[in-house]
Design a protein with these regions (language model features):
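Sec-dependent signal peptide recognition
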Residues: 2-7
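A sequence/structural signal for flexible, mid-protein segments enriched
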Residues: 17-259
Length: 259
């Protein structure tokens, strides 16, 4: 009797199988805008085209994805400057392109300033794109930075970085942090943005994990630093729209499953 039940259950399980084929449509290429402006620094804009999810990534494909000969304008409300296209080596024999200040038109050029809003206009392939951002005033600024033995790790050379800072009273401040180790690049943390919903008006003492390169496979000790490292900590005050973008992007990056 038990054998018969087992056979019936096995047959039932196999009968539930069904092959499903998804007919994924090719999405049209869209313009991807990566624009930055910081206090005391010139604006930079990188324009690329998206490519198919199934594309085989190589240097040539990346080079061909850059959008060239676009008209790119940035304004601080007083001056409007047309950015110039520049080429720089991506890998040996392959060039990448960005737009930044035109040294031939310095009368309208400017760098980022605190408490200033900016608008960006891009004209490419007969289409116009517009966006706006703001560099806020400095709000919370770190009081001190120090290192402690990394928790739950026996290696005494591994260190965790802590930051003590005071958040001014009044909701509406947003932050992003990046770290640079020795002569490396500035890299954002896995959760690089946060707001003042919890820390408003308080002094907090929090661990800030090392920034990560999302092109590399994850490492068990990637949150920590090594004894002897030179660490540069970049603590940014950002506006709400910038916070919302990075918060959404990082949440999607860490989520498992379909977008």
């Amino acid at each position: 009797m038990n054998k018969l039940i087992y056979i019936l259950l096995t047959a039932l399980l196999f009968s539930c199988e069904k092959n499903i084929d998804f007919n994924l449509k090719e999405s049209p290429n869209v313009l991807v805008v990566d624009a930055e402006i910081e206090n005391g620094k010139a604006p930079t804009v990188v324009l690329t085209r998206s490519f198919s999810y199934y594309s085989q990534i190589n240097a040539q494909l990346l080079s061909e994805s850059f959008v060239r000969n676009a008209d790119v304008y940035i304004s601080n409300g007083t001056l409007t400057h047309k950015l110039k296209e520049y080429a720089y080596p991506l890998v040996p024999g392959v060039l990448a392109y960005l737009y930044s200040i035109d040294s031939a038109s310095l009368s309208t050029a400017f760098v980022g300033e605190l408490n200033t809003g900016y608008t960006l206009k891009i004209i490419s392939d007969g289409k116009e794109y517009n966006s706006a951002a703001r560099i806020p005033e400095l709000a919370g600024v770190p009081d001190s930075i120090y290192f402690k033995q990394a928790p739950f790790i026996a290696d005494t050379n591994k260190k965790a970085m802590f930051v003590k800072a005071t958040e001014p009273a009044g909701l509406g401040n947003f932050y992003r942090y990046l770290t640079k180790v020795n002569n490396g690049l500035f890299l954002p943390g896995e959760n690089s943005v946060f707001n003042d919903q919890v820390i408003d008006g308080s002094t907090y003492d929090v661990q800030f994990p090392q920034g990560i390169n999302r092109n590399d496979p994850p490492k068990a000790d990637s949150n920590f630093y090594n004894r002897g490292d030179t660490v540069t900590f970049k603590y940014c005050n950002i506006d709400k729209s910038t916070y919302t973008f990075w918060n959404t992007w990082e949440f999607a990056y860490q989520s498992i499953g379909n977008p």
